[in-house]
Amino acid sequence: MLMKITEFDYRRISELVERARLDVDDVLGPVADIISMVRDGGDDALRELTGRFDGVTVENFRVSREEIEEAHKNLEPGVKEALREAASNIEEFHRMQMPSGWMSEVRPGVMAGQLVRPIDSVGCYIPGGRAVYPSTILMTVIPARIAGVERIVCCTPPAQDGSVPDAVLVAADMAGASEIYRVGGAQAVAAMAYGTETIRPVDKIVGPGNIFVTAAKKLVYGEVDIDFPAGPSEVLIIADETASPEYIALEILAQAEHDPQAASVLVTDSRDLALEVKEMVHENIKYMERANIIRESLERYGMIVLTADIDEAVDFSNAYAPEHLVIMTDSPEETLEGIRNAGSIFLGELSPVAAGDYGSGTNHVLPTSGCARMYSGLSTESFIKKPTVQRITKEGLRNLQGTVLKLAEYEGLHAHAESFRRRLRD
């Protein structure tokens, strides 16, 4: 049944928020083997694995400057202009995110503060294969460049002829990637984490991917940093009787076309709206190019939740912690005040998720599967470190001595106490 309607019940909330997750446990063994192969075999292992999984023989993994220039010549001008406009908006938004360092006198003679420093090198995984995602390059590379990352590596699976799509190369060049490699899957993650003869290791790996990429990121975490766990895409829409059922239906269809495991949820206090949306979804599926994917997605993970009021809808949304949250109520800003958990939020009927996916400037690399409860989406801050700094004068030592000496001795760390006490005596 497409878009089943269910009544909200606080006692069933854990059941209602369930949806598809990437269960990587089943593939951890094979992925660990792939990682070991790349660690031990370097480029030769990458070639073998690329031939096995992608059916492609690759001699040179690194994309040349000549290939990038050729891509600029070949790419359709309209697509190139759209990428340029998207890049401009993404850059403007992410520059506003950049934090500043600071220093403060916390006590007389005690200056303490925080610096802002970029990560040295970052790897951006760009999904490929049957689909082309140049927008994901913009979303991963531009924030890294703005943060000041010196070396930004992109890895993406090669096409059947060994090439990388023109749009991907142009987007990477526009965004400011330092290096682009034609390698994908878990083997690309392993190469970025541990290095090969061609690909030097990086300090952090970001970007979405399939279950094997996600498992590989999980396994290399600790050797490198990663962004956050990834899973199937999802949207939750909070709507009242003032909302357009057509806009809601189209938002649901747009999300469902991503993947058979994508989740699309409407939460409303209007039964009439729920029934209208359900009918419109049914009517419009047949006009969609990806109708089979949409139908499977909505049969498995499509849902309409009826609540007593919008406050209950907000409670459900916070428990669900959606990747994308659309608010179509009479006063979306007022509804927003109660929202705590969401990856990216779209206010009002004229703010579709597609705008955030491609053009508004916000990032579309977002936490899924409830991870918005503790993760934020990719941002400029994803690529920086914040070391703390302090400078203390003799006056500051005197002001701190009671606290420092008492606690150091209480914890039995007498050398700590002496290192402090000696400075007071000198």
UniProtKB/Swiss-Prot annotation:
GO molecular-function term, one example from the UniProt record: NAD binding
Source organism per UniProt: Methanothermobacter thermautotrophicus (strain ATCC 29096 / DSM 1053 / JCM 10044 / NBRC 100330 / Delta H)
Cofactor: Zn(2+)
Pathway: Amino-acid biosynthesis; L-histidine biosynthesis; L-histidine from 5-phospho-alpha-D-ribose 1-diphosphate: step 9/9
SUPFAM superfamilies, A to Z: ALDH-like (SSF53720)
Positions of NAD(+) binding: Y125, Q187, N210
Family to which this protein belongs: Belongs to the histidinol dehydrogenase family.
Name of the protein in question: Histidinol dehydrogenase
HAMAP family: HisD (MF_01024)
A GO BP entry: L-histidine biosynthetic process
Key words, A-Z: Amino-acid biosynthesis, Histidine biosynthesis, Metal-binding, NAD, Oxidoreductase, Zinc
Binding residue positions for substrate: S233, Q255, H258, H324, D357, E411, H416
Entry note: cofactor: Binds 1 zinc ion per subunit.
NCBIfam families: hisD
Swiss-Prot/TrEMBL catalytic activity: L-histidinol + 2 NAD(+) + H2O = L-histidine + 2 NADH + 3 H(+)
Positions of the catalytic residues: E323, H324
Class of this enzyme: oxidoreductase
One cellular component term from this protein's GO annotations in UniProt: cytoplasm
Superkingdom, taxonomy of origin: Archaea
InterPro entries according to UniProt: Ald_DH/histidinol_DH, Histidinol_DH_CS, Histidinol_DH_monofunct, Hstdl_DH
Role this protein plays: Catalyzes the sequential NAD-dependent oxidations of L-histidinol to L-histidinaldehyde and then to L-histidine.
EC number per UniProt: 1.1.1.23
Binding site for Zn(2+): Q255, H258, D357, H416
